[in-house]
Amino acid sequence: MGRLFGTDGVRGLANEKLTAPLAMRLGAAAARVLTEKKSTDRRPTAIIGRDPRVSGEMLTAALSAGLASQGVDVLDVGVLPTPAVAFLTDDYGSDMGVMVSASHNPMPDNGIKFFAIGGRKLEDWIEDEIEQEMGKLPEEGPTGAAIGRVFDQSHSALDRYLHHLQQAVHTRLDGIKVVVDCAHGAAYQAAPMAYEAAGAEVVAVSNKPNGYNINDGVGSTHIDQLQKAVVEHGADLGLAHDGDADRCLAVDAQGNVVDGDQIMAVLALSMKDGGELKRNTLVATVMSNLGLKLAMERNGITLRQTQVGDRYVVEDLRAGDYSLGGEQSGHIVIPEHGTTGDGLLTGLFLMARMATTGKTLAELASAMQVLPQTLINVPVSNKAAIAGDARVKQAIAKAEEELGETGRVLLRPSGTEELFRVMVEAADSATARKIAGQLAAVVAEV
């Protein structure tokens, strides 16, 4: 069996790969690993939250049982965004946090991600320790009063998270009309409430989760619905979140998509103007458009690039004490206000920049020229075999020779799905599509 943890926790088809017994063992093992170095005699606590997909309640119950079996008190915060769970882990002073969500994945999938004390995502070696602990769990645990309990904190938790957002962004948004697509996900309450509290006129769509409709043709991975809604409602912008609301993409008043790279460009320039961009540095990943690097260079900002995954962006932000980072997909991290990507916080800061400058989103986003980019997700059965395949290497070399200095090629495995991602940037869309298609065809044959 391969490594259980992927790039963003444990994910899989609920009740097949990700079962209740597995979740209970994960909870017990995580409790033992993440609370073993606790410095006080206080009973350890864990925050647990989820998105609204149908399997969430089952997995939350199983995880809670595993945690309580090892003497951990569980504070169940209900349906809340992933960044809220990270924040509350720190705000409550808990020893760990758990989010049950498969983010942007389809409803049948689910996932489990853990946060360490302070709301930080786990490093690889800690995840390895949890996996090892799963194989040696004792049959018996604490008894009597030492067994953990489960407490419902859902009502107060939402209020605490909303207060946190209000404290982070002070700029009033009066006069701004925004359509927010909640993806029938974890932000269905929090996002409209946060934006309204800041003064914006809010039109909420895809905000009626029923357990089955999360990410179903809506949200940040299906942004065409938001594009139409923004134009229909005559809004100044639209904001699209995914199932767990750790990402945010935007749409300008004309219905044009403003992706995570462009949002980072807007926020980086805003923070630089305010003297808040530490060492004039922005942290992104290798998937970011070449246009972001060029835009930052024009404005005296250094762009650092990590491997794909917001956890690696966060690690680089922490190591270098930088103040802004993120991904093209819309995971934006502002360490002063959170330990992980926060779609709601991103939306608030983006609208605050519009309010303070008086500029439209289209005007702000024009600071970066997006080079044509084609991304093809190729279903594969053996991700490990692709990178070393001679045919793939030959195809990459040919593509890079054809592109020269006018573009780039990037092939990488998905960390959460059985896919291999083929990305090509070029001077024009036709060339990017052609070369990406050629590479994808080779990958599919392996």
UniProtKB/Swiss-Prot annotation:
CC terms in the record's Gene Ontology section: cytosol
Source superkingdom: Bacteria
Reactions it catalyzes: alpha-D-glucosamine 1-phosphate = D-glucosamine 6-phosphate
Enzyme nomenclature, EC number: 5.4.2.10
PROSITE patterns the record matches: PGM_PMM (PS00710)
One Pfam family it belongs to: PGM_PMM_I
Protein's recorded name: Phosphoglucosamine mutase
Native source organism of the sequence: Corynebacterium urealyticum (strain ATCC 43042 / DSM 7109)
Gene behind this protein: glmM
